[in-house]
Amino acid sequence: MSQELITYIVLGSHERLKGLKLPASSNKEEYVLTNFSNDEPFEKTIDNIIFNSKGNLVVLLPPSALPNQKSKEILRKISMIDQSSWGWFKYNDRKNDFIKSLKKISSSVRSIPNIEQGIYFTKRLYFSVGGIGKFGTSPFNEISKRFYSRIDPQNPLPALIIRTKNLDIFQKWIIKHL
């Protein structure tokens, strides 16, 4: 496990992720697709991927989303500090519709990130709280509560670059297969 390496895990089913192009992995960044299937529970798939990942810091991302350069630099610094840490990304302020506004309010009031915000954490913290927990319609709900039981989150990082409007397919797939 490399202290500076960051593992980016893109969440979604095999069908949702099959045409997705990811940046090439390097000595500083590792990119992995979850490719959820009906053969294995989501929680076990994520636990196995995180266990086998090479990075000290893990970032769970929605399909077709990546952190911007500023966020990557901050994540690299967090990874190098080697302290238990977790947090999420801000909402993109450019897209402003009613539903997005409700999600922003919900996220700030509950202090639990939504799927389109992504979440990051250290591998050590993840396994100290027993893994992801129940992976339901709000995938980061359970794990956020577990992390809160240990430490407070970092301030949200700059918004993810989302290259699709099609995040609902991922959520519908999860709901349909729970």
Sequence positions of predicted segments:
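N-proximal low-complexity "stem/linker" segments adjacent to membrane-targeting elements
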Residues: M1-T34
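Active-site nucleotide-sugar/metal-binding loop of Leloir-type enzymes
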Residues: E43-V58
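Conserved donor NDP-sugar-binding/catalytic core segment of glycosyltransferases
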Residues: L66-F98
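Aromatic-glycine-rich donor-binding/catalytic loop that engages nucleotide-sugar donors
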Residues: I112, E116, Y120-S138, E142, ...
